Amino acid sequence: MKRDEIDRLLREKTRMWERRIKDEDLFEVVEEVFDTATVKTVLELMRRKILRKLNGVISTGKESRVYLAYGFSGEPLAVKIYLTSSAEFRKSIYKYITGDPRFEKIRFKDTRSLIIAWAHKEFRNLKRMYEAGVKVPKPVACLDNILVMEFLGEENARYPLLVEAYKELTSEELKYLFQLTCEELKKIVCKAELVHGDYSEYNIMIKPDLDIVIIDVSQAVELSHPNALEFLIRDIENIYRFFVKEAKLDIHREQIWSKIEPCLKEKGVQSS
């Protein structure tokens, strides 16, 4: 069989599967993120029995959409689909990849290949943090531009972010959350040996029992990254600013630094 004939049959097979997906209502929402390549990736995740059904959007951003999904055992999952056509996003992520030894040998021929690498970077960061005991969603799988992880929420709704929930909390509860936030930052740096890079009230979920979950770790870099200290200082400033200006707590930067500085010195990272 000639190559052209093989390609034609593959295209027909893909179109047939796409129609079947829509006909069987495996997708409840079809948006611009579902280009042909992304549909193929979703199909492959279904073939591997990782996903059974995609539901509605949990959250949206400039670079991705997160959907509620279900696995073959009925377990709820969060599916993050990165947009592969965002040129602006491509520019914004270079500073996190340049200097990362995990990407030294990778060559990005186009925006899609870069975004795929970015999705896999988040999966690896999630796995590393999860194994280090950081409170993050459990990573399940990553294929092309799609990341599958544990869903954290109730009744098909994700847990609220710190920025969404803090106004309903007491001063004592906010003090408790500040301590938890510092402890998780310490675990990210000292146990996972990473810097989050965007540690803020927008990337911390609050559970009903006031436990926290750290999300959006794609930009996290290793401590050896040339900009690691700069990113860490920014993370600390983000937390300090929020708990002082928004939560109105009487705290000091040193309360955050004191938890991290000893292990930075131990790992040979100069903090000043």
Describe the function of each predicted region.
Residues R15-D35, E44-L45:
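N-terminal, Lys/Arg-enriched amphipathic/low-complexity engagement segments
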Residues M1-W17:
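Long, low-complexity intrinsically disordered regions enriched in Ser/Thr/Pro/Gly
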Residues E31-Y159:
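Conserved ATP-binding subdomain of kinase catalytic cores across diverse folds
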Residues F103-K109, A157-E168, I214-E222:
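Short glycine/proline- and charge-enriched loop/turn segments
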Residues N145, N203, K259-E261:
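A glycine-rich phosphate-binding loop feature that marks nucleotide/adenosyl-phosphate handling sites
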Residues D110-K138, C142-L143, R158-G197, Y202, ...:
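Conserved kinase catalytic-core helix
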Residues T170-T181, C190-H196, K207-S272:
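C-lobe/activation-segment region of protein kinase-like
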Residues L83, G153, E201, I206, ...:
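Short, glycine/acidic-enriched loop or turn micro-motifs at the edges of active sites
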